[in-house]
From Swiss-Prot:
One of its GO terms (molecular function) is metal ion binding. The lineage of its organism: Bacteria, Pseudomonadati, Pseudomonadota, Gammaproteobacteria, Enterobacterales. Belongs to the ZIP transporter (TC 2.A.5) family. ZupT subfamily. It comes from Salmonella heidelberg (strain SL476). Pfam families: Zip. Fe(2+) binds at N120, E123, N149, E152, E181. Zn(2+) binds at E123, H148, E152. This is Zinc transporter ZupT. Its main location: membrane. The gene is zupT. It comes from the Bacteria.
Length: 257
């Protein structure tokens, strides 16, 4: 249980990398940000559809109705929360840095922070649950989550810093979203320790797979296209899928996971 918790902590802490980039003014190019988001989406799609969902369905005692039902619940649950939460895109905030409305920018950044925090909370649970069930998949999910946490931290810290002039305040607000992910992992660690039934774990994995697919197709890929409309995010997606698939083959070949 310790390694999955550490992976969750590291994935959430990646938000601070973006936060520091935001206050230091060394913003990565839009092309790099877009590619990293596509790369993260590719990792999540491959792991969710080729590993997590099949593993959940293959669990002894798991019925297809329950497995696919939990997958659909994960999909619909994500879309439902996404529609209910205050929603602003990171690149919108980065563009607003040029406008002389610091108070408005700060309010928007805070709303985004709250939305991202609620959005990151189940990601922390997903990372922990996946790593607890299968460590090699946990590494992949943690990497994908960390990659897309970096532009999130950058998106919040940059505008807050521009509005307040305080690096500490900017890092604080950006860090909240990362802490929400860590909190999700810690709660999963505390609660799921007594709920280690294979069926329960498989059902949660199926739901997590649905969440990851929805996150990839509804958020990461469109966001990558918006950030860098001149380049196709599919390259990042395909690269993420290829590298993750190759790494899983290597890990399975040498007997890890």
């Amino acid at each position: 249980m310790l390694v999955p918790l550490i992976l969750t902590l590291l994935a959430g802490a990646a938000t601070f990398i973006g936060a520091f980039l935001g206050v230091l003014g060394q913003k990565p190019s839009n092309r790099v940000l877009a590619f990293s988001l596509g790369f993260a989406a590719g990792i999540m799609l491959l792991i969710s559809l080729m590993e997590m969902l099949p593993a959940a369905l293959d669990t002894e005692g798991m019925s297809p109705v329950l497995g696919y039902g939990m997958f659909i619940i994960g999909l619909l649950g994500y879309f439902g929360l996404d529609r209910l939460l205050p929603h602003a895109h990171p690149q919108d905030l980065m563009q607003k840095r040029q406008q002389p409305l610091p108070g408005s920018i700060k309010r928007t950044a805070i709303l985004l922070t709250l939305g991202i925090s609620l959005h990151n909370f189940p990601e922390g649970i997903a990372t922990f649950v996946t790593a607890s069930s299968n460590l090699e998949l946990g590494f992949g999910i943690a990497l994908a989550v960390a990659l897309h946490n970096i532009p999130e931290g950058l998106a919040v810290a940059g505008p807050v810093y521009a509005a307040t002039g305080s690096k500490r305040t900017a890092i604080f607000w950006a860090g909240i979203s990362g802490m929400a992910e860590i909190l999700g992992g810690v709660l999963a660690w505390l609660i799921l320790g007594s709920l280690v039934s294979p069926i329960v774990m498989a059902a949660i994995m199926a739901a997590v797979a649905g969440i990851m697919v929805a996150l990839s197709v509804d958020e990461l890929m469109p966001l990558a296209k918006e950030i860098d409309p001149n380049n196709n995010p599919s390259y990042g997606v395909l690269c993420g899928m290829s590298i993750m698939g190759l790494s899983l083959v290597i890990l399975q070949t040498i007997g890890i996971g």
